[in-house]
C-alpha cells in the first residue's frame, strides 16, 4: 500500500514538494470491490475490479446527472481523469449505464463473477434500482441524452467516430448511442487511487531538491515520487515509462554521488 511515506520522509529532510499536489491517477473501480482492491486475490483477478468501458454508455452521479464527456477520447487517455471525477461526485460514486447493444463489447471485467450491477427491462425500472441516486432526475437525464444522439453518424468503437450528441450542455463527443435496447445494466463505481501527481522536485540527475532548488546530498527519487510529470491528463502506461526513465536517471546519479 502506498501511504505517502516517501513524501513524508522527504519533507522531514527539507525536500521541496512539486507538481499538482491535489491531482491523482484514479481508475473507475467496482464500488463494492474487496478492501484495498482485493490484495489477497491473484493479480489476474484483482484487475477485474476495473470498470473502464464508460465510453460505451453514460455515467450518472447521485444527483442523476452526467458529469463527464464519456466519449471525449479513447479510454486510455481519459480513465485516470474520470476515476478522479467520480471521486469528486456526491458520495464519491457513480453508475455506468449500458444497454444490450454493447454488452458483447464490454471488457471481461464486467462479466467477472464478483462484478456488481443491477439489471432491468425498462429504463424506469433501472433508474429505481440505482441505489443512492435520484431516480426521476436519472430518467430525465437519460431521456435528454437519448433525444440528443446524432443518428446521422455510424457507430464505430474502433475509432473516434464522431457519433455525438447535439444540444446538450455536456456533450458526448464519440460513441453516442441511444440507450434503447433491453436489458439495461448499471454498474456502481468509485475511483481507485493509484498514485498522486504531486511529489518531490528533482534535478535532471534525479537528485531531490530543497526549497532553494539545491540538491539534498545523497537523496534521489524516481517514478511516482517525482512531482510535476503529470497534471490534468495521463496517457495509459506512461507511469511505467516515467519510472523507467527517472529510475535510470536516479540510479546513475546516485552511483556518481560522493555519498
Over which residues does each language-model region extend?
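Glycine-rich loop(s) and the adjacent beta-strand/alpha-helix scaffold that form part
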Residues: 1-33, 240, 246-249
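Acidic/polar loop patches that form or flank catalytic/metal-binding clefts of enzymes
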Residues: 13-22, 66-68, 135-139
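Phosphate/diphosphate-binding loops
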Residues: 36-79
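Short, small/polar residue-rich loop motifs at catalytic or cofactor-binding pockets
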Residues: 52-54, 194-196, 236
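Gly/Pro-rich active-site capping loops and adjacent beta-alpha segments
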Residues: 65-94, 215-231, 235-237
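N-terminal leader/propeptide and maturation segments of large enzyme subunits in energy/redox metabolism
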Residues: 96-156
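Short glycine-enriched, charge-decorated loop/helix-capping segments at active-site entrances
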Residues: 111-115, 233-238
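A glycine-rich dinucleotide-binding beta-alpha-beta segment and adjacent secondary-structure elements
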Residues: 137-233
